[in-house]
Amino acid sequence: MAHKYQYTCEGTIRIKREDEDFTTFVYVETNLYEATIQEATEWFEGMLSKYAACYGIDSKFSQVGFEVTSVQQKD
């Protein structure tokens, strides 16, 4: 079994309602234990996309998107 490192992952989910002029940002931070930074980034990106999809099924939101902003290995 490969050694797993701890990574701190940060990202945002952008949501906008149809009748509003501004975008709301949801900040997400978590710690993951993965073998490589690529695996941590892919896992976190998948998690953010699923979380954003929850907003996407609500018809009140006209625009939904997400972005991984940081993945860093902790010491």
Language model features by range: what are they?
Residues G11-I13, A40-L48, V64-F66:
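Amphipathic alpha-helical segments in structured regions that serve as interaction surfaces
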Residues S49-D75:
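Short, mixed-charge low-complexity intrinsically disordered segments
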Residues Y33-D58:
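A short, charged, amphipathic alpha-helix used as a generic interaction element across diverse proteins
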Residues F22-Q38:
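A short, exposed loop/beta-hairpin motif centered on an aromatic-Gly-Thr core
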Residues A2-V26:
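Short aromatic-glycine-(Arg/Gly/Cys) micro-motifs in beta-strand/loop hairpins
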Residues H3-Y5, F25, N31, S49, ...:
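Intrinsically disordered, low-complexity segments enriched in small/polar residues
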Residues E18-E20, Y33, S62, Q73:
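Intrinsic disorder/low-complexity segments
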